[in-house]
Amino acid sequence: MQGSVTEFLRPRLVDIEQVNPTRAKVTLEPLERGFGHTLGNALRRILLSSMPGCAVTEVEIDGVLHEYSSKEGVQEDILEILLNLKGLAVVIEGKDEAMLTLSKSGAGPVTAADITHDGDVTIMNPEHVVCHLTGNNEISMRIRVERGRGYVPASARAQTEDDDRPIGRLLVDASFSPVARIAYNVEAARVEQRTDLDKLVIDMTTNGTLDPEEAIRRAATILAEQLDAFVELRDVTEPEQKEEKPEFDPILLRPVDDLELTVRSANCLKAEAIHYIGDLVQRTEVELLKTPNLGKKSLTEIKDVLASRGLSLGMRLENWPPASLVDDL
């Protein structure tokens, strides 16, 4: 096996064994030692709690006002019927909720196959028993199915609904997760000469609405998205300090000696208390010509030297001189 000793192996989806229509075993290998339990536990928790799915949330049964009652001609009490309805495995396509209806008469079992629905809904377990009728009795109900995630108890939804909720509309504890059971096992794996690797085997039982491979892919995507915040830590730095733009061009803060003028011109400027280039550029030609011993030749020299630095006489500088120069004087 080639590669750096610090390079981590990347697992691959090795096998999906379909044990029965609702149970499958998914195998991933090779994994670095210890990563079998690390990933197995994380994926197990996500698969149990975070897979989106559909569940029954409300039921209305003709002739029934509340869940703590029974219905004549029905073998089960209402609470047991609601519990059975929670076992429906439903898939909704293209929308977030659907209304199903169930009407049945005559003695015998009432199953999910007796439920009528539109083409956007598929019931994956039509053999699922809802209740049993006795004699020549009938039952009719309307069932609301919604898409969601996790577990939402009926009591939590009751607190958010208005007090005018119709009598007879029964709320159901909604378990949206399509994963009924999940377990994992870590076995030994080998790649060429390395025998200290892990093989992760995930044993998953669903309600038949979720493909095992798709379930693993969704769980891994959720895990990766949650970890992105840690990956992006390298991009989180202290707020960038904005560089304060200097109030004056640095060249204006330099002494006039840096202009390397002739001795005559330099002495004339010093006699007028012109110590910095910023002092000089604010003077006009007329003002400089009034300076003793500074003639047109010196003026021309000064203008040429300033021009070579992108400056000129007669410039206006707000707030000149800066405090730092005043302190130095």
From Swiss-Prot:
The keyword Iron does not apply. It is an enzyme of class 2 (transferase). GO terms for biological process: DNA-templated transcription. Residues 248-329 are annotated as: Alpha C-terminal domain (alpha-CTD). One of its GO terms (cellular component) is DNA-directed RNA polymerase complex. It catalyses: RNA(n) + a ribonucleoside 5'-triphosphate = RNA(n+1) + diphosphate. Signal peptide: none annotated. The keyword Transferase applies. Belongs to the RNA polymerase alpha chain family. Homodimer. The RNAP catalytic core consists of 2 alpha, 1 beta, 1 beta' and 1 omega subunit. When a sigma factor is associated with the core the holoenzyme is formed, which can initiate transcription. DNA-dependent RNA polymerase catalyzes the transcription of DNA into RNA using the four ribonucleoside triphosphates as substrates. This is DNA-directed RNA polymerase subunit alpha. It comes from Shewanella violacea (strain JCM 10179 / CIP 106290 / LMG 19151 / DSS12). The gene is rpoA.
